[in-house]
A protein has these predicted regions:
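Alpha-helical support elements that line or immediately flank enzyme active sites
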Residues: 52-54, 279-284, 520-529, 659
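Non-catalytic terminal extensions that flank enzyme cores
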Residues: 1-50, 73, 347, 605
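Alpha-helical recognition segments enriched in aromatics with Gly/Pro capping
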Residues: 202, 260, 288-300, 407-411, ...
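N-terminal catalytic cores of NTP/NDP-binding nucleotidyl/phosphoryl-transfer enzymes
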Residues: 27-90, 152, 215-217, 257-284, ...
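Protease-associated
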Residues: 208-273, 279-283
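Secondary-structure transition/capping motifs at alpha-helix termini
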Residues: 64-72, 93-106, 126, 130-135, ...
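Residue patterns forming the tRNA-binding/recognition surfaces of aminoacyl-tRNA synthetases
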Residues: 4, 13, 17-21, 91-211, ...
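Short, solvent-exposed turn/loop segments enriched in Gly/Ser/Thr/Pro and often Arg
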Residues: 31-32, 40-41, 76-87, 140-148, ...
Length: 677
C-alpha cells in the first residue's frame, strides 16, 4: 500500500467503478424493504456549490447506511427546468448574440432553450457523478420530460374540475426584469434591510391655504394615488376627514379618508393610498371603493396613465430620482430622510418586486392543504429540527391562494384555450378544449367551429410556476400519473408498482427556505392523489455562511472554489468536514479548518489500515491480548449502538464527532498500540 492516501486517485477510481457497474441501481425486490431518498432537483442552470455538497453528502450518508443495513436503497436523481432562471439565462445568451426574445416566435425561442439545456443542463449531474454520489443514474428525471409534462397538465385540469384552480384579478408580486408574476415565497428580503429614502411630500388643500404632509418611500407612484388615509383615532387629523387635497405635479384632487390600518407613528401619520401599487393600499382601496389606476408598464416604466408626459416611458427608479427636483421646484417637498427599509426582491433576478394588479391563475389552498397541516402537526410527517413546525403552523394558518401562472415561454404551458369572446376551455389537449367549445356553441344555437382545423381557439400564452411541477416530484419520478383514474381523481397506486414499492420515501434533505415552496406542497399533492405521505421525515439543513455570517455566493466573492478544495482535501475529507459542523437546522460558518480535520481523519484511517496490513498473520488463538480484545469488542459495540442511535435521531454531527474520537483515540492511540506485535 502507498504510504500516503491519494484521495484524488482513489475517489476517481471508485466513482468510475460505481458508474460502470451500476452499483447503485435499484429495482423492486419484495424480499427486502425499500429505503428511498429523492434528490431535491437542482436547477438545470446549476453548478455544484457548498450548499449542494452539504445537502448531497447527507443524502449519500443516509442511503449508504441503509444499503449497509440490508435495505433496497434507491436514491433518485433529477433536474428541474427552472422556468424563470433558465429563461433569464437564455435571454442573456441571446442578447450577447444580438438577438431579442421579442423578435422570435415562441417555437424559435424554445428551440434555443432546448439547445441551451442540452449543452449546459447536465453539468450539475455530471459533477455529482464525479464526486461519487450513490444515485441510481438510470432513474434521472427532468421536469419537462414527456411523461412529466403530461402529469403536470393532467393535475392542472383535474384541480380545475375539482374547483381548486381559478382565474382571478388581484395584487401580485411582479418581476419587472423577467416580466412575470411571482408567488410570495419567491420574494426574498435582505435580513439587514436596504438603504432607502423617506420623502415628505406636501399635498395642498383644495379648499383654503395650507397642506398635508405625507411621507412615502415611493414618490414615483403619486400619480396613481386615490386618497390620503389617516387613522380615525388620530386627533391631529380628525377634522380633515372628508376634505380633499391635490396630488403634487398633476393637481388631481383626492379625498382624505379614515382607516385603522394607518400607523399614527410612521412618518406624519398620513398615508398616500395607491391601490394599484401596494398590497395594503389595495386592501384599503377595496374597503373604501377606490379606483385602481396602474401607471406602470410590465417592464417597470411609467405609462401614459401617469398623466405627466415627461415621465412616460422612463424607468420607475429613474423617475424616483428625477421627481425630487420637480417637487422642489413647486415647493411640494418638505424634506428627505435616509432610512433602512425592507425591500422585496425576486429570488431569481434580484429585481425589486413591484406589487401589480394582474389577472392570473390561482390554486385555492385553504381546503386543499388541510390534510398536510394535520399530518405535520401530528408528526405523521416529522420535521427535524422540530421547531420548524412553529413556522409551518404560522404559515398554514395564514395560507393564501397560490398564484401559479408565469409570463414566460419556457415551462409547462397552461392548458386553457380562449375563444373570440374571451371564454376559456380547460383540457389536457386542444382536442378536449375544442369538444367543450363545440358544446358551448351548440348550447347557444351557434354554428360549429369546424373542430381543431378551424383554428378558432388560442392557447393561453403563460406557463406554470416551476413549483407547480416540482410539487409532483415524489409521484412522477415513479411515473405515477400513468395510472391516474379520471373517475376517482386519484392515482391507482396498486397498479403503479414502483410507486407502491418506493413510496413513502424515508427522508428528504432540504433547506428551510423552501419549506412552503416545495416541502409543504409535495405533502399536499401526495395526499390529494394517493392518500399517502411523500416522505417519513424532513431534515432541514442550515445555510452555509462565511465567518462574517454572510451566505456564500459568487456575487459576494466569498465562495471558495470547490474543485480546488477537492484537490486539496479530497471529497471524503470535505464530506466529513461539512457534516461534522452542521447540527440540524443551524447555519454553518464555513471554516477550511474543518475540511483539514476531515482530510486528516481519512489519512488516519488509511494509516491504521496500512499498519494492520503490515502485520503477519499468526495461526491459532492469541491468549496474550484476550482481555484487550474483550474490552475493545465491548467498546466497539457501545460506539456502534451510540452511532446508530445518533443517526436515527438525525444527530449527524454528534455521530461523526463520536466516530472521530473512537477511531483517533480508542482504536489508533490505544487498541492498535496495545495489540501490535
Amino acid at each position: 500500500m502507498e504510504k500516503n492516501f491519494n484521495a484524488k486517485e482513489v475517489e476517481k477510481k471508485w466513482s468510475e467503478y460505481w458508474l460502470e457497474n451500476k452499483t447503485f441501481k435499484s429495482s423492486i425486490d419484495e424480499s427486502r424493504p425499500s429505503y428511498t431518498v429523492l434528490i431535491p432537483p437542482p436547477n438545470v442552470t446549476g453548478v455544484l456549490h457548498f450548499g449542494h455538497v452539504l445537502n448531497n453528502s447527507l443524502q449519500d450518508f443516509f442511503i449508504r447506511k441503509a444499503r449497509k443495513q440490508g435495505f433496497n436503497a434507491c436514491w433518485v436523481p433529477g433536474i428541474d427546468h427552472a422556468a424563470i432562471a433558465t429563461e433569464a439565462k437564455v435571454v442573456g445568451y441571446l442578447r450577447e448574440k444580438g438577438i431579442k426574445k421579442s423578435d422570435l416566435s415562441r417555437e424559435e425561442f424554445l428551440d434555443y432553450c432546448w439547445e441551451w439545456k442540452e449543452k449546459y443542463g447536465g453539468i450539475i449531474l455530471d459533477q455529482l457523478k464525479t464526486i461519487g454520489a450513490g444515485c441510481d443514474w438510470d432513474r434521472v428525471t427532468f421536469t419537462l420530460d414527456d411523461h412529466y409534462y403530461k402529469a403536470v397538465v393532467r393535475v392542472f385540469v383535474d384541480l380545475y374540475k375539482k374547483g381548486y384552480i381559478y382565474k382571478g384579478k388581484r395584487i401580485i408580486n411582479w418581476d419587472c426584469e423577467a416580466q412575470t408574476a411571482l408567488s410570495n415565497e419567491e420574494v426574498i428580503y435582505n435580513e439587514a434591510g436596504e438603504k432607502a429614502q423617506l420623502f415628505y411630500l406636501k399635498y395642498k388643500y383644495v379648499q383654503g391655504d395650507g397642506y398635508l404632509t405625507v411621507a412615502t418611500t415611493r414618490p414615483e407612484t403619486i400619480f396613481a394615488d386615490m386618497a390620503v388615509a389617516v387613522n380615525p383615532d388620530d386627533e391631529r387629523y380628525k377634522c380633515l376627514i372628508g376634505q380633499e387635497v391635490l396630488i403634487p405635479l398633476i393637481n388631481k384632487p383626492i379625498k382624505i379618508i379614515a382607516d385603522s390600518y394607518v400607523d399614527k407613528e410612521f412618518g406624519t401619520g398620513c398615508l398616500k393610498v395607491t391601490p394599484a401599487h401596494d398590497i395594503n393600499d389595495y386592501e384599503i382601496g377595496m374597503r373604501h371603493g377606490l379606483e385602481i389606476v396602474d401607471i406602470l408598464n410590465d417592464d417597470g416604466t411609467l405609462n401614459e396613465l401617469c398623466q405627466y408626459p415627461e415621465f412616460i416611458g422612463k424607468d420607475r427608479f429613474k423617475v424616483r430620482r428625477e421627481i425630487k427636483t420637480k417637487l422642489e421646484e413647486i415647493d411640494c417637498l418638505e424634506k428627505v430622510e435616509d432610512i433602512v427599509n425592507k425591500v422585496g426582491r425576486s429570488e431569481r433576478t434580484n429585481s425589486v418586486v413591484e406589487p401589480k394588479l394582474s389577472l392570473q391563475w390561482y390554486v385555492d389552498m385553504k381546503n386543499l392543504s388541510k390534510k398536510a397541516y394535520e399530518v405535520v402537526m401530528s408528526d405523521e410527517v416529522e420535521f427535524f429540527p422540530k421547531y420548524h413546525k412553529n413556522t409551518f403552523n404560522h404559515w398554514m394558518t395564514n395560507i393564501r391562494d397560490w398564484c401559479i401562472s408565469r409570463q414566460l415561454w419556457w415551462g409547462h404551458r397552461i392548458p386553457a384555450w380562449y375563444d373570440e369572446d374571451g371564454n376559456f376551455y380547460v383540457g389536457e389537449t386542444a382536442e378536449e378544449a375544442y369538444e367543450q367549445y363545440e358544446s358551448y356553441l351548440k348550447a347557444n344555437n351557434r354554428p360549429s367551429c369546424g373542430g381543431i382545423e378551424g383554428g378558432h381557439l388560442r392557447q393561453d400564452e403563460d406557463v406554470l410556476d416551476t413549483w407547480a411541477s416540482s410539487w409532483l416530484w415524489p409521484l412522477e419520478v415513479f411515473n405515477g400519473f400513468e395510472h391516474y383514474n379520471r373517475e376517482t381523481g386519484k392515482i391507482d397506486v396498486s397498479k403503479s408498482k414502483d410507486l407502491d414499492y418506493y413510496l413513502p420515501t424515508q427522508i428528504i434533505v432540504t433547506g428551510p427556505d423552501i419549506m412552503f415552496l416545495w416541502i409543504t406542497r409535495m405533502i399536499i399533492a401526495n395526499y390529494e392523489y394517493t392518500d399517502r405521505k411523500p416522505f417519513e421525515k424532513v431534515f432541514f439543513t442550515g445555510i452555509v455562511r462565511d465567518k462574517l455570517g454572510r451566505k456564500l455566493s459568487k456575487q459576494l466573492g466569498n465562495s471558495p472554489d470547490l474543485y480546488e478544495l477537492i484537490d486539496k482535501y479530497g471529497m471524503d475529507g470535505i464530506r466529513y468536514g461539512m457534516m461534522s459542523i452542521s447540527p440540524a437546522g443551524n447555519d454553518i460558518l464555513f471554516d477550511e479548518k474543518s475540511l483539514e480535520i476531515g482530510r486528516n481523519f481519512t489519512n488516519k484511517i488509511w494509516n491504521a489500515f496500512r499498519l494492520i496490513k503490515s502485520w503477519e498473520t499468526v495461526e491459532g488463538k492469541n491468549t496474550e491480548n484476550e482481555a484487550v480484545f474483550v474490552w475493545f469488542e465491548a467498546l466497539l459495540q457501545k460506539n456502534v449502538n451510540s452511532f446508530l442511535d445518533n443517526i436515527d435521531n438525525l444527530r449527524i454531527s454528534e455521530a461523526l464527532k463520536d466516530l472521530y474520537s473512537f477511531v483517533w483515540d480508542d482504536l489508533c492511540s490505544w487498541y492498535l498500540e496495545m495489540i501490535k506485535p
